[in-house]
Amino acid sequence: MRPLSFRRRTAQARPDPAPSRLSYRVQRLLLTPLFHALIRVGLPAFVLAFGVGWLLQNQELRDELVAQTIALRTQIEQRPEFMVNAMSVSGASTELIEDIHEVVPIDFPVSSFALDLEAMDRIIGELDAVAEVDLSIQAAGILAIEIVERTPAVVWQTRQTLEILDAEGHRVGPIESRAAHAALPLVAGPGGNRAVAEALRLLEVAEELAPRIIGLQRMGERRWDVVLTEGQRILLPEREAELALARVIELDQAEDLFARDISVVDMRLPDRPTVRLNPDALDALWTIRGLTNDRIE
């Protein structure tokens, strides 16, 4: 038989197989994906950032790094394949090309990295005569600018200036003399620029009167007068002006209205058109009426 003391020593030497609570939590933490990611990515990133930060504490080293970075960037930007040597403008008149060179002065050759095409597009697009603009850098170092100019539609006369407008009323540019653009119809009066489309429709309706028409005058920024030669006028209503003008044209074709001694055809009340005689014709009419009355009496 074995002694009892030996059994007690054996029982005391046996280790406890259950881990401690702290050990269990540490083992679970080591097995989590987040901890693996921190060890694989976070720790190297921290070491790298710490090393770079420690190196950049040296002012001379920082200055050298900045200088090398600038030199490398300049070297890349100045490579021949990135250089722009000339500008090409298409679709623009000579005057507009001069304006473009004035608003976007470029000292060639220049690196394409130094050109802000978006800003240039905005600046050129703000020119009055430009409807559309497209910029691109093409092969052989050419800055290509494609322009769509506004098409002149009317001459707008204000108290101070003469300006050319397109069919939408956008300003194309000022002019010094009406004679230089005599082929364009004349529009006058405040607010005329905001009703160019209507003015063009009226002129189309009044094509039969074209040789007599001097222009259209905006009245009170709400309606049009058609100004004719010999001091004659057609006063149009605010609404359905085209229909009212068409009625006047029909009347002229039937009765040769504007060959008569009249000054105004008032269509502001379309249901009650009014014809106003010239002063001389009115005096003659009153004289005739007076003579007639004398004879009756």
Curated annotation (Swiss-Prot):
Pfam families for the chain: FtsQ_DivIB_C
Domain POTRA, first and last residues per copy: 82-150
Membrane topology per record: Single-pass type II membrane protein
Keywords: Cell cycle, Cell division, Cell inner membrane, Cell membrane, Membrane, Transmembrane, Transmembrane helix
Topology feature Periplasmic, residues: 55-297
InterPro entries per UniProt: Cell_div_FtsQ/DivIB_C (IPR005548), FtsQ (IPR026579), FtsQ_C_sf (IPR045335), POTRA (IPR034746)
Transmembrane feature ranges: 34-54
Gene Ontology terms describing biological process: cell septum assembly; FtsZ-dependent cytokinesis
Cellular component terms (Gene Ontology): cell division site; plasma membrane
Cytoplasmic topological intervals: 1-33
Localization: Cell inner membrane
PANTHER family linked: CELL DIVISION PROTEIN FTSQ
Similarity comment: family membership: Belongs to the FtsQ/DivIB family. FtsQ subfamily.
Protein name in the entry: Cell division protein FtsQ
